[in-house]
Curated annotation (Swiss-Prot):
One of its GO terms (biological process) is protein transport. This is Membrane protein insertase YidC. One of its GO terms (cellular component) is plasma membrane. InterPro entries: Membr_insert_YidC (IPR019998), Membr_insert_YidC_N (IPR028053), YidC/ALB3/OXA1/COX18 (IPR001708), YidC/Oxa/ALB_C (IPR028055), YidC_ALB_C (IPR047196), YidC_periplasmic_sf (IPR038221). Pfam families: 60KD_IMP (PF02096), YidC_periplas (PF14849). The chain crosses the membrane at residues 6-26, 381-401, 451-471, 525-545. The gene is yidC.
Amino acid sequence: MDNKKIVLLIIFSTSLLFLWDAWVKEQEKFNAPPSVVAQANSAAGVTQSKNNDGLPIPGSELTASQTGSDLNGIPSSGDTADSVTPRLLPSGEQIRVVTDKVIAEIDTMGGDLRRLELLQQPSPEDENVPYSLLHSEASRTYVAQSGLVGEGLPNHKTVYQVESGIRNYELTAGEDKVVIRLLAPETQGVQVIKTYTFHRDSYVIDIGFEIANKSDATIRPFAYFQMLRDDTPPPAHTMMIRSFLGAAVYTDEEKYQKIPFDDLDKGKTDYPANANNGWIAMLEHYFLTAWLPPQQTPREYFAKRQSDNLYTAGVIVPAGVITAGETVTTTMPLYAGPEEQDRLAELAPGLELTVDYGWLTMIAKPLFRLLSFYHSWTGNWGIAIILLTITVKLLFFPLSAAGYRSMAKLRLVTPKLKRIQDQYKGDRQRMHQAMMDFYKTEKINPMGGCFPILVQIPVFIALYWTILAAVELRYAPFALWITDLSSPDPKYLLPVLLGISMFIQTRLNPTPTDPIQAKIMQIMPVAFSAIFFFFPAGLVLYSLVNNILSIAQQWKITKMYGTAPSQDAPESPASKDAPELPVSNQVINDSENTEAPASGPADSPKKPVNIPRRMHKRTRKK
């Protein structure tokens, strides 16, 4: 009865279930039938926000001309269609911007940010091509839109003109920022200029509106900023990657809250709408786009499904009260880039929570901090993982040592356990009782080797999510053929070495007395090795180093505590005279042909077997 092997079998079975679940969900995504969810307009009129210092939030009937409004006076991105494929948005002239971090394309149609390539993040299809975070294509849609709410004011359907006439901008040496100004047609005495400001060494883009009121009336416009995207997952370079895709909102009161696209399909709006702090974002694996309104500024967050499979998430803020002849500027920072945790924590409170560590965040965060510390020291994420593995191993050393000592003792008495099983193979209840009595007599805990494994399982899972979620490990090289620790080993050498290390470990463990368990233990190294073909190389590296350290520790402890006693050594009094196991002792002595001592009489009777009372009763019944 090898309980450690049972635990390993449970872990193996659970891993298979996770793989199956991931595969089924992935297939459902591709086989999902087309569906169109009807959307209702927001309530008519102007509503009052409870957290906006008395400033009104616009309703869907601001003007008669906004009959096509989708939310709070914001025009929808198009008519409803029956297709689940994103449409190609209307376009005008393209304005190209190149900085040290990004290549951006702004469309004069709506002044939308239609494309954003991250120069320091390779594409999963071709690592020589920058990753495209934003894009507007026939098959994929993910753009940043903005505009003003009010009669005749420009929105993301307005055609802008480039004020300077320049179509290509580049952040040159000595410049800290580059500014693009788009001029909207003047209507009803209101002139609006939309601005984009790109900064050096930053993924933050400031999008603003300069509103000049040349009329005689006072105006109270609102500005909206939204992300429009489809529900198509970004391309992944490993089948084991599955992370959250959808919107998220954060406020000081409600904290961090995810908004899955499925909830928007069902019309659920269980998220904080009105606040004067926080942010709203669109998330995908490794990357995000987030609107970051200034603190203590009244705002209304919104997220909903548009037509077909397009979704919006954004924020509405008041642009202020603009009297005749006055010019007001309102600006909204947009972060569009990788989920670099140190950078996110500096931008806005709670923004680092967008890094998805799953349900073991409390363990994963310290692991990543320690991993980052080792990386800052070594400059190599692979070496950092090895050092982290050694640290975790040292942390659990006392538990592991206790478990291995228990296994070493169990290895010594395995032949005796086998004889007990042979004696009671027709009566499982008596066999179990005899084995438990034997464990008690020999002071062996059969579960002693399982506890260290159970304790380390959460650490293993947390490290799995750390490696999957940390964009810092994306395309991070280790050595030789390992050029990306976040993707599987391209040559499968690490999984094979892991399987070999597991096989060596099984040879150090007590031989299972059950033939079925013995067969399973022979298969497990091969099965685990095959499963780890699809795991990130960084996780396989952790498991391999952990196994090597475990083998060294287990071999040393087995050598110290697991040496079999000499054939001439006298039998311990506990195993000889213990009343709990007289029958099994008798069987063991008989099988070893134990003879009476030479000093005693030749015809001296054998010592009677001291059978416990409960066994006498069973014998009489039988």
